[in-house]
Amino acid sequence: MLEKVVIVVHLLMALGLVGLILVQHGKGADAGASFGAGASATVFGSQGSATFLSRITGILAAVFFLTSLGLAYFAKEKSDALQHIGLPDPAVLEQKQEKAPAADDVPVLQEQSKPAESAGDVPAAPEQK
């Protein structure tokens, strides 16, 4: 039950971080203005939204990292529980099966009835009239 709550909080923090980062003004990049951040100076005062959004982004990032650590802890507990049950390690079960080498992978052509007239690899050019 607690793991599901942590997963939901983790997803909400991820979506919140993406939204906040898109809304913020970057140096030289005003992509946030298209999402309504252009009028934020009137809402948040003369400093604008930089400090407010930066603080909220930092808090969401900290909660995101904490939920990530929590999910790692839950994953570790599940793997330890599987080992205590007596299930073998999947890496031990997986064995390499050596492939038997083929005798000859190159197809054999039928032998020609008469040998080539020249000793070179290139056939003779036809005579011109």
Curated annotation (Swiss-Prot):
Coiled coil (residue ranges): none
Compartment annotation: Cell inner membrane
GO cellular component: plasma membrane
Function as written in the Swiss-Prot or TrEMBL entry: Involved in protein export. Participates in an early event of protein translocation.
Region feature Disordered, mapped onto this chain: 93-129
The gene coding this protein: secG
Highest taxon, organism lineage: Bacteria
GO terms, biological process: intracellular protein transmembrane transport; protein secretion; protein transport by the Sec complex
Record bears the keyword Transport: yes
Family, as annotated: Belongs to the SecG family.
Organism (species): Pseudomonas aeruginosa (strain ATCC 15692 / DSM 22644 / CIP 104116 / JCM 14847 / LMG 12228 / 1C / PRS 101 / PAO1)
Protein's name according to its UniProt entry: Protein-export membrane protein SecG
Keywords: Cell inner membrane, Cell membrane, Membrane, Protein transport, Translocation, Transmembrane, Transmembrane helix, Transport
Membrane topology, from the record: Multi-pass membrane protein
GO terms for MF: protein-transporting ATPase activity
NCBIfam families with a match to the protein in the record: secG (TIGR00810)
Transmembrane feature ranges: 5-25, 56-76
